[in-house]
C-alpha cells in the first residue's frame, strides 16, 4: 500500500519533464534504435534456431542410415541453383526492354540524339550505369585490354583503403585519410592507432606554438599628470583613509579628516605610474585554459545572482527595527525588539525553506530525467554491441556450414588407421586445418577474377606490385564477410567530394557488388540522402 504512490510519481515525472528539456529527441532516437536492434536480434535468434534444427535433422538422418556427405552435396547443389536463379532474375530486371510499338517512341517531345542512341545500344548490351563511375578505365569492366595504368592504379589503392577500413577494429585503430592512399611510397594507405594519432596531433600543436613568433611587450610610458587636471575629492579620500586605518589612533584619523593637513600631492601619481609600469603583460593562455576560465566565471556569476535573489526575497530586519518607537521604556523596547527579531528570522527561514524545497524538487526531477536518458542510451549501446556479436556469430556459422563438407572429408580420412578412440579423436582434431576452396569457387572469386583482367603493363608497374601484394591478404581469404551496415558506417565518415570521386566510387561499387552483395537500390538511396542532389544517370567518360 505504501509503495504504490511512489511508483506513480516516478512514472509521471519524465512525462512532465519533457517540456522542460530539449533532449527528448535523443531519447526517442535511442528508443527507435533499441526497437530496430531488438528486431534484428530476434531475426538472428531465429536464424540460430534454424541452424540448430538443421544440425539435429542431419544427426537423425545419419542415425537412420542416410549418407552424410550425400545430404551435404544435395544442399550445396540446391543452394547454387537458387543463387543462379536469383542472378538471372536480377539480370532480367536490369536488362533493356525496347518499346513494342513505334507509336510509343513517337510520343516523345524530342527525337533521340546520337548520344542517346549510343546509350541505348550500351543498355541493350547489358551495361549497368552506376553513379559517378567511369566505363572504360574501370576495374568493374569485363575486360581491360586498352586501359590506362594510372586510373587503374588509383582505383586499386582506393579499393585497398576501403577493405582495410571495413576490417579493422575501430576501438583501437583508425584509418588515415583517403588522399594518403595514393602516395607512391605507401600505396593503399595504412591504419594507425588512436593513441599515436593523438600524440602526433599534440606534437604538431606544440611545434606550431614553438614556431609562432611571441608577442612583443609594449612598455607604456608613464603619463605626466598635472595638478590642475587631477582634483581628487577630499571626502572620498578621507573615507578611504578612515576605512583602511581600522586600528589607528583617533589623532591620526582626525589628522586625515582635517582639510588643513599637508598631503603629498605627487605620491598618488607616482604609485599609479609604478603600478602601471610593474603590471605584468597578460600572457596568451591555451584554448583549454581559456575555456576553463570562462566556465568558472559563468559559474561564479550564477552563484552571485542566486545569492542576490535570496537576499531580496528574505525580509529585512532593519525595517522592523525602524518602526519601533521610543514611547515605551527601555525594557519594553528591548523585549519588543527581541520578539520582532525572532518573528522576522522565522519568516525568513520559512521562506528560504520553501525556495529550497522547490529547488530540490526541480533538481530531483532533473536527476530522474537524466537517469532515464542514461538508461536509454546505455540500453541502445548494449543492443548495438549484442547485434554486432550476433552478426559475428551468424557469419562464423555460415562459414562453418559452407566448409562443412570439406572439413567432414578431412575428419573422415583421418580414421584410416584406427588404434584408440581418444587418440583417433585427438589426431582428427589436429589434422583439420584451413580449407581452401575448390577450382570453381576460386575462379568465381573477385580477387582471382580481377587478377585475370588486369593488363600486363599494370602488373609490371612497380607501385602497382605493392598494392597487389597488399590486396593478396584480402583476396586469399575466401570466407571474408562484410555486412552492408558496416560499409555505410565507413562511408558516412567520408566527405561528399570523396564519395563523388570516380576512383573512390569505383572502389565502393566493386566492394558493394562483388564482396558485400548489397543491392544497388539501397546504396543509391543512401547516396542520394547523403549527397543531397539528384544523381545523373550519364556516366563519366575517361
Swiss-Prot record:
It comes from Rattus norvegicus. This is Coiled-coil domain-containing protein 60. Residues 70-97 form a coiled coil. Residues 228-284, 334-358 are annotated as: Disordered. Residues 245-261, 342-351 have a biased composition (Low complexity). The keyword DNA-binding does not apply. It comes from the Eukaryota. Keywords: Coiled coil. InterPro entries: DUF4698. Pfam families: DUF4698.
Amino acid at each position: 500500500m505504501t509503495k504504490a504512490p511512489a511508483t506513480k510519481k516516478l512514472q509521471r515525472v519524465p512525462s512532465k519533464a519533457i517540456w522542460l528539456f530539449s533532449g527528448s529527441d535523443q531519447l526517442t532516437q535511442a528508443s527507435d534504435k533499441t526497437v530496430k536492434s531488438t528486431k534484428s536480434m530476434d531475426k538472428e535468434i531465429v536464424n540460430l534456431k534454424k541452424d540448430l534444427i538443421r544440425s539435429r535433422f542431419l544427426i537423425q538422418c545419419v542415425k537412420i542410415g542416410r549418407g552424410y556427405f550425400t545430404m551435404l552435396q544435395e544442399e550445396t547443389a540446391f543452394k547454387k541453383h537458387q543463387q543462379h536463379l536469383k542472378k538471372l532474375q536480377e539480370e532480367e530486371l536490369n536488362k533493356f526492354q525496347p518499346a513494342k510499338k513505334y507509336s510509343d517512341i513517337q510520343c516523345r517531345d524530342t527525337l533521340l540524339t546520337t548520344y542517346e542512341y549510343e546509350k541505348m545500344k550500351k543498355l541493350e548490351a547489358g551495361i549497368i550505369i552506376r553513379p559517378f563511375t567511369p566505363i572504360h578505365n574501370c576495374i568493374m569492366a569485363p575486360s581491360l585490354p586498352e586501359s590506362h595504368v594510372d586510373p587503374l592504379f588509383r582505383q586499386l589503392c582506393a579499393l585497398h583503403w576501403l577493405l582495410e577500413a571495413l576490417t579493422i577494429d575501430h576501438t583501437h585503430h583508425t584509418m588515415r585519410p583517403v588522399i594518403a592512399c595514393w602516395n607512391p611510397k605507401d600505396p593503399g594507405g595504412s591504419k594507425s592507432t588512436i593513441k599515436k594519432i593523438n600524440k602526433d596531433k599534440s606534437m604538431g600543436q606544440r611545434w606550431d606554438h614553438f614556431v609562432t613568433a611571441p608577442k612583443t611587450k609594449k612598455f607604456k610610458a608613464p603619463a605626466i599628470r598635472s595638478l590642475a587636471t587631477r582634483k581628487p575629492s577630499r571626502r572620498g579620500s578621507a573615507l578611504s583613509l578612515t576605512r583602511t586605518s581600522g586600528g589607528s589612533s583617533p589623532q591620526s584619523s582626525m589628522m586625515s579628516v582635517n582639510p588643513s593637513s599637508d598631503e603629498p600631492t605627487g605620491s598618488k601619481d607616482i604609485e599609479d605610474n609604478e603600478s602601471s609600469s610593474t603590471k605584468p603583460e597578460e600572457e596568451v593562455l591555451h584554448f583549454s585554459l581559456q575555456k576553463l576560465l570562462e566556465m568558472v566565471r559563468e559559474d561564479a556569476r550564477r552563484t552571485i545572482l542566486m545569492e542576490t535573489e535570496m537576499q531580496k526575497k528574505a525580509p529585512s530586519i532593519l525595517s522592523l527595527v525602524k518602526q519601533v518607537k521610543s514611547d515605551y521604556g527601555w525594557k519594553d523596547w528591548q523585549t519588543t525588539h527581541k520578539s520582532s527579531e525572532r518573528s522576522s528570522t522565522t519568516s525568513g527561514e520559512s521562506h528560504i525553506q520553501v525556495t529550497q524545497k522547490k529547488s530540490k524538487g526541480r533538481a530531483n526531477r532533473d536527476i530522474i530525467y537524466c537517469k532515464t536518458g542514461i538508461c536509454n542510451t546505455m540500453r541502445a549501446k548494449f543492443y548495438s554491441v549484442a547485434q554486432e556479436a550476433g552478426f559475428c556469430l551468424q557469419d562464423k556459422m555460415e562459414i562453418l556450414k559452407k566448409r562443412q563438407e570439406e572439413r567432414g572429408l578431412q575428419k573422415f580420412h583421418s580414421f584410416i588407421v584406427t588404434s584408440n578412440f581418444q587418440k583417433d579423436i585427438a589426431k582428427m582434431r589436429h589434422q583439420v586445418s584451413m580449407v581452401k576452396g575448390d577450382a570453381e569457387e576460386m575462379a568465381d572469386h573477385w580477387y582471382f577474377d580481377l587478377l585475370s583482367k588486369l593488363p600486363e603493363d599494370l602488373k609490371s608497374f612497380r607501385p602497382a606490385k605493392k598494392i597487389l601484394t597488399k590486396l593478396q591478404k584480402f583476396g586469399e581469404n575466401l570466407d571474408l564477410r562484410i555486412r552492408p551496415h558496416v560499409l555505410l558506417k565507413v562511408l558516412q565518415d567520408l566527405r561528399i567530394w570523396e564519395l563523388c570521386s570516380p576512383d573512390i566510387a569505383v572502389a565502393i561499387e566493386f566492394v558493394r557488388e562483388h564482396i558485400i552483395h548489397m543491392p544497388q537500390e539501397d546504396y543509391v538511396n543512401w547516396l542520394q540522402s547523403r549527397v543531397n542532389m539528384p544523381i545523373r544517370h550519364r556516366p563519366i567518360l575517361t
